[in-house]
Amino acid sequence: MVVQEDNPNTGDVQEKTETAPVAEPSKIFTVEILHMIKDAQQQHGLRHGDFQRYRGYCSRRIRRLRKALKYPQGDKRHFKRRDVTIGQLTGKKADERFIHIPLICAERAWAYAMQLKQESNTEPRKRFHLVNKLRRACFYALQLQELCNTEAFDARTKLECEAYVAWMHGTLHFELQLWKTAGEHLKRAQVVYENLGKALPEDEQELYRAKVNEFTPNLRYCAYNISGGASGGKIDEILELRAQGVLENLDVLVSQTKTESSEGLQTIDWRGRKVTVRPEKVRLFLLSAQELDKSLAKTTKQDAKIELIERILMDCKDAIQAVRDEIKQDPKLRSLTTGQTVSGVQYLLAYLSYIRHSRTLQRNLCLVEQAKLNFYDPNLQSQQNVGDGKRVRPQDLARLYEIILQNVTEMQQINGLEDDATYQSEVENLAITFKAFRCYYIALTLIDIKKWKEAVALYERASNYATEALKGKSSPEFQLQEELKKVVSAIDGCKFSAHAYSVLEDDNSEESGTTTKSQKTTKPLYERLSLYKEDQSLHTKAPNVFKLTPDMEPIPCKPIFFDLAMTYVELPSLEGKLESPGKKGASITGFVKGFLGWGGGGNK
């Protein structure tokens, strides 16, 4: 290294050569904090809300990092705390993994706090432990920020660290119900993530947009609490917060914010009759049900609509149970004889039952609309593009309409509304409408399996149902006339098409029958010389002209005879005709014996 020096005596500049080595430029690290923690959370339990599993992963990750970096905290017997310092992130031996240690420590403390939050519903004392763990997470987050603010990290890492620290402090203050400071921290994190996402490429912006949207419910809840909840225009916002699962004590919140409104809702007017509403839970539910339509109008996705309706159905179930408990306490209301006027409480129960069935029907119609996004109807020319999801078959839609018809049948059987002719006619017309849709999709199912005649019959029945439904009185809550008209116009064209296919199928079957009979003959040529037929097999190497080996023919064989009579036949004796042993002539052996003197015992 060459250094220029001024000589104080002469004033000349002299060059001095040093033997010190040239300093290497320090490394600059880039840590994608949000991307890293989101990947870890999705892979280790938070996809299913399992914070305990994620906390265990963080502990194992910290242990592996310290072991790999040879930076333990003491030995097996003694613990000696060793925090990460800037020395490990600068110089020749700088390693980016050192910055992961405080980050994973903060994530571990946060995961433990969220686990305690789930358990604090049944054990309130755990909230103290929860707050302590969040404080610990904030401590590690500040330690992370102190390291990231050095020159060892680039601007993106510093921005991500700032947003992460603000979010962690906002979460702590949110649990401490310090609404003003919580809102400030969360808003700061939201602004940083939003601006950071705009500066990144398009393929990386989606993660930051999702994170920005996560702050919106908490910020609105903080703003609501800061304003004291006096604004009645934010009731629908609170209900949307409930749909997103942010509020755990919605019943207490709604009872505090809707006191004045619930006092005005002492009676309901339904189908020309006023009924007093006494249970507090029912009043709160009715207010929520009134605001549901506004929330559904703001929502465009079918999944979000279904979730909102299902939450209202759960509240409706609790309200119905409250009314039934009140009926059980009054012996006069337990039984209702035929012809007797329905009491106010029982009429209220009928009204709540109607809300439950109508909202269930609305939920099922949302399921139908969701299924139609991935269904291709060959009869509708106006249908543009089918979704990329799983292909929906016509029998799936027919099954959904079958469930809807069961729901309509339950609506007809609501206690207290059997004698209401107007109501019964509306529900009956609704049932006919859904029967038309069901027959239409069953016909499409039959067309897929080439049953043209049955499809024509079901098209005709669907057309009759649709025409009858259009003539009847429609329900004010379910306007399905436009869909019925589309179905009728589609049936008018496809019915004749299916009929034509059925006629063609009959003609083809007759022609194919005669053709197959003539073509399936296997007689050789010499047996069918009087018949003309273009037989391509005669031009092959093995033409069917004459069969040299005759076919085997069955012939009668010798019958099997079982001679059972021989068992009982007594044959005459032949002993008298046999030659006796004494008369048998002497053999040559006896002659030799006698001649030689041995064997003759008679001379002795």
Swiss-Prot record:
Keywords: Cytoplasm, Endoplasmic reticulum, Nucleus, Ribonucleoprotein, RNA-binding, Signal recognition particle. InterPro entries: SRP68 (IPR026258), SRP68-RBD (IPR034652), SRP68_N_sf (IPR038253). Residues 1-21 are annotated as: Disordered. It is found in: Cytoplasm; Nucleus, Nucleolus; Endoplasmic reticulum. The keyword Ribonucleoprotein applies. GO terms for molecular function: 7S RNA binding; endoplasmic reticulum signal peptide binding; signal recognition particle binding. Residues 1-12 have a biased composition (Polar residues). One of its GO terms (biological process) is SRP-dependent cotranslational protein targeting to membrane. Pfam families: SRP68 (PF16969). One of its GO terms (cellular component) is signal recognition particle, endoplasmic reticulum targeting. Belongs to the SRP68 family. Component of the signal recognition particle (SRP) complex, a ribonucleoprotein complex that mediates the cotranslational targeting of secretory and membrane proteins to the endoplasmic reticulum (ER). The SRP complex interacts with the signal sequence in nascent secretory and membrane proteins and directs them to the membrane of the ER. The SRP complex targets the ribosome-nascent chain complex to the SRP receptor (SR), which is anchored in the ER, where SR compaction and GTPase rearrangement drive cotranslational protein translocation into the ER. Heterodimer with Srp72. Srp68/Srp72 heterodimer formation is stabilized by the presence of 7SL RNA. Component of a signal recognition particle (SRP) complex that consists of a 7SL RNA molecule of 300 nucleotides and six protein subunits: Srp72, Srp68, Srp54, Srp19, Srp14 and Srp9. This is Signal recognition particle subunit SRP68. It comes from Drosophila melanogaster. The gene is Srp68.
